[in-house]
A protein has these predicted regions:
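A glycine/proline-hinged amphipathic helix-loop "lid/cap" segment
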Residues: 2-108, 359
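Alpha/beta-hydrolase superfamily serine-hydrolase fold, recognizing
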Residues: 5-25, 94-359
Length: 359
């Protein structure tokens, strides 16, 4: 064989490895569920109000600062900046640092919360930024509406750690919360799991692992704008790129790459095969999962991650519900009560969890 033949075989081998091992067969679409309540769409007539414009301005400024620090490889500054997203918010809840079996965390407890009723919350931030502090608006709200104690974990972040370390910390915290409340060992009466964005990814990965390990399952789960497919093959990754003011600056370079290169970038960055259900819960077995609510914006890049996950879960027989809002930024729920749509989203979360509250 001549040099060109060997080169051709090498290229073919690399293509096959990426296409069938790294990326896998993928999930393009699943049929819309026949359940009339899934999906639910929320929209408001007319132009966005002044509160929406103000939040957009805040998000653009915050995102610009964070992306600038990341380009400068100043992770400390990027993380400190991201942690200010809940700054200025008045909280009813109190916050107490704790150690969840070796995982740093904080308890978030609203007045009158029952500590035998608990929520494990996993923050977002692209696996790189974020902490319990950045997401106090969300965790405090969860405690208020459910009357539960919320355990917000400070899992290990990339790039200092591997993606599998993020996953392992979530599993460790889950074991711990089953037996421990804010005041020490205490029997658990009710458990929910929640997460947003990258934390939504970890949340959905966690409930599949809980099922496989036959552990006590949560009564329900809530995933806000979850990343479900790190092959980044959803159509909205590109189609909504210009509308997503929060994610576009961080995913601009990734979005410009061919799929072949993108798969190798994910393997290098995450140190995990992109099609591995551990990192791409969409590509795993979605049967026999607990009731799950997924919320997403129709203007965000991860819309199809949410949509495809819910449709596949429904097709697999799991009680999963999708709710979408028009013209919202990624994780708009964190801007409660500034945004009327955030208030609406929390009303829906409250109704969903109330429907799955333990007796």
């Amino acid at each position: 064989m001549n040099l060109f033949a060997w080169l051709g075989l090498l290229i073919l081998a690399f293509w096959a490895f990426e296409r069938f091992y790294l990326r896998g067969l993928g999930v393009k679409e699943y049929p819309t569920p026949t359940d009339p309540d899934a999906p639910q769409r929320f929209s408001r007539a007319g132009k966005p109000g002044p509160e929406h414009m103000q939040v957009n301005k805040t998000v653009r400024e915050l995102t610009l600062r964070i992306s600038t620090y990341q380009r400068q490889h100043n992770l400390k500054a990027a993380r400190e900046t991201f942690d200010t997203i809940s700054q200025g918010h008045e909280f009813q809840s109190e916050f107490f640092p704790t150690d969840a079996g070796g995982v740093p965390a904080e308890w978030v407890i609203a007045p009158g919360a029952d500590t035998s009723r608990r929520i494990l919350y996993i923050h977002g931030g692209g696996f790189v930024v974020g902490s319990p502090k950045s997401h106090r608006t969300i965790t405090s709200k969860f405690s208020e509406i459910t009357g539960s104690a919320v355990l917000a974990i400070d899992y290990r972040l990339m790039p200092e750690h591997l993606h599998k370390d993020c996953v392992e910390d979530c599993r460790t915290a889950y074991h711990w919360i089953l037996e421990n409340g804010p005041d020490g060992p205490e029997e658990i009466q009710q458990l929910f799991i929640g997460g947003d964005s990258a934390g939504g990814n970890l949340c959905l990965s966690l409930i599949a692992w809980i099922r496989d390990k036959k552990l006590r399952a949560p009564e329900a789960a809530v995933a806000l704008s979850p990343l479900t497919d790190i092959t980044f093959s959803g159509a909205s990754i590109r189609s909504n790129a210009d509308r997503d003011i929060m994610l576009k600056p961080h995913m601009k370079i990734l979005n410009s790459l061919p799929q072949f290169v993108k798969s190798w970038w994910v393997l290098w960055t995450y140190k995990v095969r992109p099609s591995n259900p551990l990192a791409s819960p969409l590509l795993g077995d979605l049967s026999n999962l607990p009731p799950t609510l997924v919320q997403a914006s129709e203007a965000e890049m991860l819309l199809d991650d949410a949509r495809r996950y819910v449709y596949k879960a429904c097709a697999s027989g799991s009680p999963t519900k999708l709710q979408t809002w028009s013209d919202m930024m990624h994780i708009w729920q964190i801007f409660d009560p500034q945004l009327p749509q955030a208030v609406e989203a929390w009303i829906e979360i409250d109704k969903f969890l109330e429907g799955h509250t333990a007796a």
